[in-house]
Amino acid sequence: YILGLEEVKDKGKKLISSAQNPQLGSLYENIASKLNQYSKPNDFESIIKLMIIWINRILFLKLLESQIVKWNAKPEYKFLNPTKINDFDKLEMLFFEILAKKQNDRHHREFDYIPYLNSSLFELHEMEEKSLKISNLADDAHIEYYAKTIIKDENLKRKTGEVCTLHYLFEFLDAYDFSSEGSE
């Protein structure tokens, strides 16, 4: 829902497509709009490629965040939240100016507790170089909470109304336990 995708059946096969009734603030619509604005190809495949690159990074970071918090027993080390990452520019900075650099080479000190990750995941992807960086996305994009959202308010009722898409993504990921090791 947040991504702006849905599952459809075509000739007995389940396929993923853009939402029939799109939320303008969804990640898909935000990417499509910006690709169009910059006169870059905005076909389904191009949009999905960018989305996969970015969501893979964010999911990896969610796993990393949960381990950092667990190892240090410091909830304040959570960094995928609107307080520390309030827009797509800051998220891009985290990708390329924090995670991709050794602590000594960083210009930003607010994330010193996050280790250097010697990983191609945090190098600018060819697709980003050719088309769009995550910082190009509209920070003011908003989306309605999904009617059956798992995200609850302080009264334990499902949240309603509009929310910034990036903040919704962080809230959604926070609703799951990424620190569990599972049963063997």
Predicted regions and their residues:
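Preference for the N-terminal adenyl/adenosyl cofactor-binding alpha/beta module
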Residues: 1-184
